[in-house]
Amino acid sequence: MLDTAQDADVIDQGAFFACKVTEVEHFTDDLFRFRTARPATLRFRPGEFLMIGLEGEKKPVLRAYSVASPSWDDTLEFYSIKVENGALTSRLRHIQPGDRVLVGRKPTGTLVTDALKPGKRLYMLSTGTGAAPFASLIREPGVYEQFDEVVFTHTCRTSPELTYSRDLVEALKTDPLVGEAAAGRLIYFDSVTREDGPRTGRITTLIETGELFERIDRPALNPETDRVMICGSMAMLDELKTMLEARGFEEGSNAKPGDFVVEKAFAGEGV
């Protein structure tokens, strides 16, 4: 008899789902994205993360990964860095379509619009793989119903590391579900820090000097009108949080919505 369970796209293992990998794309030596089948019962809010991983010798090796796909997608997408000696990514980097990845059952996180007060403009500030939750959010029709404008910034060391977000934003233009809503309302700004280019500099510096706002032709951050989501390195999170609080922004949470939110539990360096 055929083992239909092993042939299934998703196997329910109790604490986790074993989901079949459907697609893998490598952008640089350090960055890649992959898609898996999605469990029919798995629901999440755009911007949340899940524990994902691989089977280990004694127990699964798991890390928190933001879901990069929108909530309406019938697959799950994740965006990952490759760390040579990372407990998970040193193996995850070699996955191929047909392999299985463990996916947790309980999405959570603070990078959700529920944790923000109503506002006019939503800023999504990211570095590196911190772009992942925003990849989900900018593909959600509801985000464009909540905010007049969405500003998505992505800062990396070099231009090739921006390929994921650039391709994503370009594909949105012809997306049948959100393309029309995003047109003229989604503002994408990228910058690099370790090479010359048309836009260079850390996002914290670009905000502090006002160059970001000059480039996108928008006023400086204002807690009366703007809401901010932040995902990236710990140093970037801490610096931006300090900058925002100095400007009168209050940090929000699922329990008490505010003017800005940060996410610290994402798949970053050393995983």
Q: Can you annotate each of these PLM segments?
A:
Residues P107-K117:
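A short, basic/flexible loop-to-alpha-helix module at the beginning of a structural domain
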Residues P133-E145:
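Histidine-anchored nucleotide/phosphate-binding helix
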Residues L122-L125, M229:
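Conserved beta-strand elements of the Class I
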Residues L2-Q6, I11-F17, T153-H154, T158-V271:
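Reductase modules of NAD(P)H-dependent flavoproteins
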Residues T127-P133:
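Ser/Thr-glycine-rich phosphate-binding loops at phosphate-binding pockets of nucleotides
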Residues L2-D99:
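Ferredoxin-reductase
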Residues G47, G130, S233:
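Short, conserved phosphate/pyrophosphate- and ester-handling motifs at nucleotide-, phospho-/glycolipid
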Residues L116-R121, P223-E224:
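Short helix-loop-beta connector
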